[in-house]
């Protein structure tokens, strides 16, 4: 199978209806979901007061979203392959709206956690959207469209911080969630009206046992990573969760290999192009998130520390915003490079650009414009990598497995960001400096995290070098040749 995608209209056949609106609608949906993930950042420090709970308890408002997203992303991808990607996209957007309403109505901890968990269930929107593109767009348009949808993750994250800070500064904090609900309704209606349903279906029975096993293993793993610093990395709880994750995921893997219709086809996942791309995704995810962990903190620390810039949260968000716009602007460039040289080369170039951006930031971190420049360079690299990874995945899996495969790749990136958060937390907690009666993360600690981001990007580059290279022209021809057979299979399974 190929990344070119098998919905090119044949001579004498009309193109699918409404495809001109598909890309902007799916990009908007991706932006709305990524905005949701940054909503609570401006009010994290005030949540204990708002919800009448301790800081450790209110941290679950973030952890619940992470865990729900980890479980929902692969599950929704598989359900999309089976029952319709547009249908599961609508379900995901509905979960975002419901979760936003629940959080918007909450004044205590439990409803907030429930609402944030429901919001996390929408995280499969971007991989589902990319999978829809494969089914609906002709091959020549797929690369740029995929890069744009992938970039929507960065755009939403970069624009979400200043937007959320602006809302939190001028309105009641519940307005953050009502804004999310309103945007979710708009995106849901646009998807319902303008995005066609794919005919590519696998049918069959859903692997409920496999979903439960994967969910259990992922929850144990991510819970240990995200809460290990609070509980202690050597505590029985943390070590027990890591051990449970290893045992559960190994057992899950053996089970999936013996099931006729597994949640994740591990034989497909073990193909070199898929496996190596997913490994590179973990490293790239680590590299991407390091920027988000360091730059806002450095911008907001008091100038009296000697290295902080004393900016407000809103100003810090505005500094980060251009990086998201750079990601979107370079999406077509990423697609052109992939078409000319292949997505493997695009991924490697992107990883090098990310590493260069971090190297630049290690040297330049004393002026606001230094951070604007560094974040834009890093954003450019992320735009290249995030456009290339789905193309590599789709180039190696059947169209009937696109949703599950893209969702697994998204999950790998999320694991990378979770590990980055944990590692940065440890580094910044250990490398502190005294500021009055407070211990603040020191300048050397921030430089170390930036250097780790560069190192992770270079590791991603090295891993990507081992991805088997397949000529783009051959892949495109192969996909077009297989399109009729796949569409027949999809129609038959639907019937």
Task: Name the predicted role of every residue range.
Residues 19-36, 40-42, 55, 59-64, ...:
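12-transmembrane solute porter fold
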Residues 95, 99-102, 110-118, 369-377:
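Paired small-residue
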Residues 71-107:
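Conserved MFS/SLC helix-loop-helix module at the cytosolic interface between two early adjacent transmembrane helices
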Residues 50-52, 84, 105-110, 171-172, ...:
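Helix-breaking motifs and short loop linkers at transmembrane-helix boundaries and internal kinks
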Residues 156-189, 206-215, 221-242:
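Helix-loop-helix hairpin linking two adjacent transmembrane segments in secondary transporters
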Residues 118-151:
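Cytoplasmic helix-loop-helix junction between adjacent transmembrane helices
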Residues 181-200, 215-227, 244-259, 460-468:
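C-terminal membrane-cytosol helix-exit motif in multi-pass small-molecule transporters
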Residues 46, 74-78, 82, 166, ...:
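Membrane-interface helix termini in secondary transporters
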């Amino acid at each position: 199978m190929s990344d070119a995608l098998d919905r090119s209209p044949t001579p004498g056949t009309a193109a699918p209806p409404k495809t001109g609106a598909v890309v902007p609608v799916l990009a908007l949906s991706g932006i709305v979901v990524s905005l949701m993930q940054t909503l609570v950042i401006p009010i994290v420090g005030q949540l204990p007061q708002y919800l009448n709970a301790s800081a450790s308890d209110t941290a679950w408002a973030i952890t619940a979203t992470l865990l729900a997203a980890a479980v929902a992303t692969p599950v929704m991808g598989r359900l999309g392959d089976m029952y319709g990607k547009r249908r599961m996209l609508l379900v995901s957007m509905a979960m975002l709206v419901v979760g936003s309403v629940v959080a918007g109505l909450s004044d205590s901890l439990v409803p907030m956690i429930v609402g944030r968990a429901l919001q996390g269930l929408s995280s499969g929107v971007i991989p589902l959207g990319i999978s829809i593109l494969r089914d609906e767009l002709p091959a020549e348009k797929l690369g740029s469209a995929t890069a744009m949808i992938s970039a929507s993750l960065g755009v939403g994250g970069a624009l979400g911080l200043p937007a959320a800070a602006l809302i939190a500064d001028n309105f009641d904090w519940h307005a953050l969630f009502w804004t999310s609900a309103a945007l979710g309704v708009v995106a849901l209606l646009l998807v319902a009206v303008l995005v066609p349903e794919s005919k590519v279906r696998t049918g069959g029975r859903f692997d409920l046992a496999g979903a439960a096993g994967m969910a259990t293993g992922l929850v144990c793993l991510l819970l240990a990573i995200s809460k290990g610093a609070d509980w202690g990395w050597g505590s029985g709880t943390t070590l027990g969760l890591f051990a449970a994750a290893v045992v559960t995921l190994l057992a899950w893997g053996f089970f999936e290999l013996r099931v006729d219709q597994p949640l994740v086809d591990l034989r497909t996942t073990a193909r070199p192009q898929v496996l190596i791309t997913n490994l590179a995704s973990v490293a790239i995810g680590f590299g991407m998130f390091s920027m988000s962990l360091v730059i806002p903190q450095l911008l907001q620390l008091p100038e009296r520390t000697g290295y902080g810039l004393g900016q407000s949260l809103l100003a810090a968000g505005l500094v980060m915003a251009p990086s998201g716009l750079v990601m979107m602007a370079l999406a077509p460039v990423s697609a052109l490079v992939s078409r000319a040289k292949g997505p493997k080369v695009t991924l490697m170039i992107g990883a090098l650009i990310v590493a260069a951006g971090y190297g630049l930031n290690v040297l330049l971190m004393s002026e606001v414009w230094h951070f604007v420049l560094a974040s834009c360079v890093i954003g450019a690299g992320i735009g290249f990598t995030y456009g290339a990874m789905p193309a590599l995945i789709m180039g190696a899996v059947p169209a009937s497995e696109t949703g599950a495969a893209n969702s697994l790749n998204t999950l790998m990136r999320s694991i990378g960001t979770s590990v980055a958060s944990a590692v940065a937390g440890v580094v910044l907690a250990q490398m502190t400096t005294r500021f009055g009666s407070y211990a603040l993360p020191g300048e050397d600690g921030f430089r170390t995290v930036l250097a780790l981001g560069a190192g992770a990007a270079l590791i991603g580059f090295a891993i990507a070098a081992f991805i088997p290279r397949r000529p783009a022209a051959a892949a495109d021809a192969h996909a077009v040749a297989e399109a009729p057979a796949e569409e027949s299979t999809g129609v038959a399974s639907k019937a």
